[in-house]
C-alpha cells in the first residue's frame, strides 16, 4: 500500500477539504500527536472556514527522533486525524485529512537550523506555537550559546529566532509575533517570556532588542483541553482503517471530540487570530485563570471525586461508571450542586462544560482505568476537590454531601484491608477480594500503613488533623469529623455504591 501524499490522496478520490499551497504563517515548536490533533486541527479548520490560507512549519524542539520529521515530510505534511468519542450522548467517529502542515524540520541535522532562521525573517510569519512538555520552558544559565546550532533549550531557540526577526526588520514594531505556549504549566506564556529575557541578558543582546521582544511581541499563556490518545493500538483496527482509506499513514493521529483552547491575550488579539471567524472552540480572554479553575475543579475534580469509591464498588473503567445510574448521578450532583455554584464564571458556560464532561467520560473509544486516575490521589483531592469543598462550606454554611462522601471514599480506598507496604506502593484489598496497589508520595503511604490497625474513628481523626495532608486541621470544620466517619462506616458496611446512593 502506498504512503499518503497529495498524489496518492487524489488517486483515492478523497473529497474532503485540502489546501496544497499557501505561505507559512505559523512556526510550531513540537511535532507530537497533541499539537497535530489540537492546534493544527484548528488551523486546518481556519483555512477551510475562515480563508486563513496559512501553513504551519513544524520544528522539532529536541533531536532525539529525527525519523518523525522524515515521516511527516514523506507525506508532504499530510496526515489523517480521527476525532472519536461521544457528543450529546451520540457516538462520534470523524475522519479528516489535515493539510495545514507544510513540513517538519529537525534543527539538529544538516543545515536545518538555517531553515528555521530563514522563516524567522519571513514577511508571512505571524505566530509561534509551542508544546515542548512541562520541562521545555526552562532556563539554565550557560546551557545555550547565541551562536549554537541550534541553542539547547526551547526558550533559547525562540530568543534566537526573535533576534533574527528583529535584525531582519530593523526592529519594526509591527513585525512582532504572537507566541502561543501550550505547555502544561501555570502561566506558560509569562514563564516563557521570562526565560527569553534571561537568555537575552546572558548573551548581552542590545537593550533595544529586549525592548522590542517584550513590547512588539505578544507572549500568551494558554489553557489546552483535549485528550489525545495519539494512535490506534489494535493492529487489526489500524489495518482496516488503512484499507478503507486506500493509503498507509505513518503519522496518523487520534484525539477525542471535545477540544477547547483558551488564550490569554489583549483586546484585539481575537481579530488577529483566524479562529473566531472559523467558528472553532478557541477563545481569547483577558485572564485564563477562571478557565483553568473550571477545568481543574469540574473535569479533574469529577474524576478524583468519584473514582476511588467507584473502584471499591467494583468498577474498573470510567465509561462503565457513566452507565451506572448511581455513580453517574453522584458525579452529576457533586458537579451541579456543589462545585459549579462556587466557580466565578457564567453558570450556563459551566453547566455546558459539565455536560461535556459526562460525554467525555462516556467515550466508547477510550478505556480509562480508574486505577490510573487514582495515582497520587492525596495531592489530587487537595488540589482539585478541597477548594470547592471549602468554598461550598463558606457560602452555604453547611457540609456538601457528595464532596464529604468523596473524602470518606478517599480514606476508604487508602485503608481497605491493608496488606503490605512495598517499595513503590501500598497493597490493599478490594471488597471483591482482589488486591490493588496504591501509588502516592511515600509519606502518604507510610501514614496509612502506620494507621492500618486504627479503628475507623481513630483513622478519620488522624487523617483530618494531618497538616501535611491538608495544610490545616479539618476537624475544626463543624460536624465534618462525625459526617466523614458516618460516611466511611456506610462504605465499609453497605458498600460504596450504596453509600453514593445515600447522597442522591
Predicted regions and their residues:
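Substrate/ligand-engaging "lid" and interaction regions
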Residues: 1-504
